[in-house]
C-alpha cells in the first residue's frame, strides 16, 4: 500500500505533533459536540458521586481524536492515564501487569481494542465488571486459580471497527460514543489553532481551503498544513496564503474534494475498464494492484461518504457525482 498523505491512520511523524497540539479539556476540544456534551455530563456525575467513570468505548474512522478524548477524560477526572494497544497485549500476563499497576480511579486506554485476542478479553471481563483479576498459578493437576482485587479504574477503548468487537466485550462498556467526521468550519478552526502553535501566519481563506480538502479529519488537516507551510517558507514569504495553499495542494495531488491519486486510480479504473460497474471487489483489487481488505477498509469509506461509490450485492458502482467530478459523461445503458 502506498504511503498516503490523506490517510487518517497515525504516521510516525504525527506522534510528537499530535501530542503538542492536544487540547487538555473538553472546553478546548473542537468538534464532536454530541459526544463531548454527553461526556461532560457523565464525568461531572461521576465526580459528584466520587466514583470512577463508567468504561467508555470510542469508535469511528481514524484520525478523529479518540486518543485525545481518552487523555481529556483522564485530565477532567483528575487521574493518570495508562496507554497501550490491542496488538501490544500478546498474553494474559501482559494485561495483568498493566492492570495491577493502576492506581485507584486511573484511566486505562486501549487503542485498537478490537485486535485483542479472545483469551485476553476473557481476563478483561471480570476486571471490567468486578475489578478483580483471576490468575492461574501452576500447570496441570496442581494448577489453581487465584483472584486478585484491583483498584476501581475506567477502561477507555478505541476502535475503528466497532463491529469487530465481541458482543460480551462491547456490552461491558457503559458509555459508547461514535465520533463523526468534522465539518469544514470545525476543521478550519483546528487549522488556525495549529498554525498558531506553529507560529505561522495563515489567511482565513487558506485555512478554509485546507479544511475542505482534509476529508473531515483533523489529523489530515494538520498534516496538509505542515506540507503547505513548507511551500510557504520555500516558495513564499512564510505566510500561508490562498495562492500558496492551492499551488501546494495541486503539486501534492490533492484535489478540491480531498481525493488523491489513489482515489482517482480506483474510480477511473472502474469507469474506464468496467463502464462504471457493477464490478466485484476482487476484480477491482486485481485491476489497481491493491489488496481487497485495504480497498474496503482504507480507500472506500471516504468515497462512500461523499457519494462517489456505491456497494451493491452485484459489486461496486461509480455514481453520477463521480462522473461529474471528472468531467465525464456516464455511459448510456
Swiss-Prot record:
Gene3D superfamilies named in the record: 1.10.8.60, P-loop containing nucleotide triphosphate hydrolases, Winged helix-like DNA-binding domain superfamily/Winged helix DNA-binding domain
InterPro entries linked: AAA+_ATPase, AAA_lid_4, DNA_helicase_Holl-junc_RuvB, P-loop_NTPase, RuvB-like_N, RuvB_C, WH-like_DNA-bd_sf, WH_DNA-bd_sf
Chain residue ranges for the region called Large ATPase domain (RuvB-L): 1-182
Region Small ATPAse domain (RuvB-S), annotated ranges: 183-253
Binding of DNA, residues: 311, 316
Keyword terms of this UniProt record: ATP-binding, Cytoplasm, DNA damage, DNA recombination, DNA repair, DNA-binding, Hydrolase, Nucleotide-binding
MF-aspect GO terms: ATP binding; ATP hydrolysis activity; four-way junction DNA binding; four-way junction helicase activity
Entry similarity comment: Belongs to the RuvB family.
Designated name of the protein: Holliday junction branch migration complex subunit RuvB
Organism of this sequence: Bacillus cereus (strain Q1)
Lineage, opening ranks: Bacteria, Bacillati, Bacillota, Bacilli, Bacillales
